[in-house]
Amino acid sequence: MKNQDLVEYLRSCGVCEICQLRYLKARGAEYRNINETLQKLDVKLNENVENEELVISEGSQPSKRARLGVCSTCLGLFSKDFQNELLSSILASDFAKYDCQKIVLAICLPMSLQLRQLAMWFALRRRFGPSIDENNPPDVPIKEAVKLILHPIICEKLAKVYDANGLMINIDLTHSLEGEEVEKLVKLNKEAFPAKASHQKRIEISRGLLEKQYQPSKVKAETYEKYFQIPCSNVEESIKLTSIDLQGPLICVAGRYRKLSRELSHTPWILNGQRLMEDSIEEIIIRHVGPHFTEKLGKITFMSSGREDVDVRCLGKGRPFVLEIPNAKRSCLTKDEAFAMERAVDASGMVSIHHLQVVPREELTHIKTGEEQKKKFYRALCALQEPVSVKILEQLQISASFNIQQKTPIRVLHRRPLHTRPRTIYSVTAKVHRGNPKALIIDIVTQAGTYIKELVHGEFGRTTPSLSSIIGKPMDIQALDVVGIDLDWPHEVDNSKHKE
């Protein structure tokens, strides 16, 4: 089968030149200049119709040659008229409210398009015989062609970059014949697949069903032709744009926070409908970062690499955190903006943040996975009932790692199941507090997920061994700080060094 023969037949069936290229299996940029591509494929130009060039030339004069009617296979989906209508509708929507450089088109196509592709598949097999495979479509599928043809054009005209994680433009299309054709398809389905139809009380007609079940190897052309014309009939009306809905991207903003207060919960602390604390780390950060990206602060998800108790500070480099912001109105964060947010959070006096930045969603694996394999570094102020002896200090200089068995602490049983968890303690060092001979400052490196307070006092033998059992004396914890978290993420950025 020669390309010229194929194209001449397609022309006789009312197929537009862009769809002719689909049946010639054109790719990418080959759709941008139809004349050039047809000549390259040894196809003579049709001088009787205006080529449907995809590049919309500003200020160009319309051709006096006759235009094609509505394409019998794409129903005008790839026409200039539809491109112009689509662009105008996008610009007339809330598109300008989104400050996003990346976009993605999600186009819901009517099933009428799939039925026309199938009708042309049957027609080509009748005309060209075995050279048209009965299992593999003879064209570039409509959905793929949309990505190859429409996406680049829309992105170029909107001055945006295509990205699957960008602003999603949901486009719903329909055609006046779809309702009638779906009814016919239900009847066809019963005849083409009687065994399946007999076992189904209700037949679900879907695009997926058409893709999987309807091809010449599974449905006879004679059966199909009882309900639909082969090749597909010409139509007067083109495809219609029914709605455009915009959904902003999911933006992830990461950084590190330091918790400076011993009277601040990690997330809102509400019990029986009553707030137990006025504020939380989550609320302070979201309050100052969220409005840059969205008005719906309640939709933002706050995550961190672990958490502290209310009375525990987090110092050092801080704890990695991330905000997941759905349907964001903005996708970028300049250093100026990030620095202003950092200063606003710092002004709370309870939380400090730094290294604030937008990160790819894929990087959230750093927060979500392998949590228990991470190391955590703590400093605890502990009290004895007697002055610290040299022996006690020696017993608490532990450089070799050891394992403990730790039951779920009583204080968290209301939100954690009762389990005994093995945990690794990597090192312990201790020194006497300068101002109190009965007090110890103990530095501990542990596996993430270790309950440090219970590691110190043992909680009536529920943690074994404990530091108290190691020295053989009662010991309690007075204050605790997290001083380090073994997670090198997100990367360090100094937002204070921005251009004025």
UniProtKB/Swiss-Prot annotation:
GO terms for biological process: tRNA pseudouridine synthesis. Residues 30-50 form a coiled coil. GO terms for cellular component: cytoplasm. Residues 267-280 are annotated as: RNA binding forefinger loop. Gene3D superfamilies: 3.30.70.2510, 3.30.70.3190. It comes from the Eukaryota. It holds the Pfam family Pus10_C. Residues 406-421 are annotated as: RNA binding thumb loop. The active site is at 309 (nucleophile). GO terms for molecular function: pseudouridine synthase activity; RNA binding; tRNA pseudouridine synthase activity; tRNA pseudouridine(55) synthase activity. Its EC number is 5.4.99.25. Belongs to the pseudouridine synthase Pus10 family. This is Putative tRNA pseudouridine synthase Pus10. It comes from Drosophila melanogaster (Fruit fly). The lineage of its organism: Eukaryota, Metazoa, Ecdysozoa, Arthropoda, Hexapoda. The gene is Pus10.
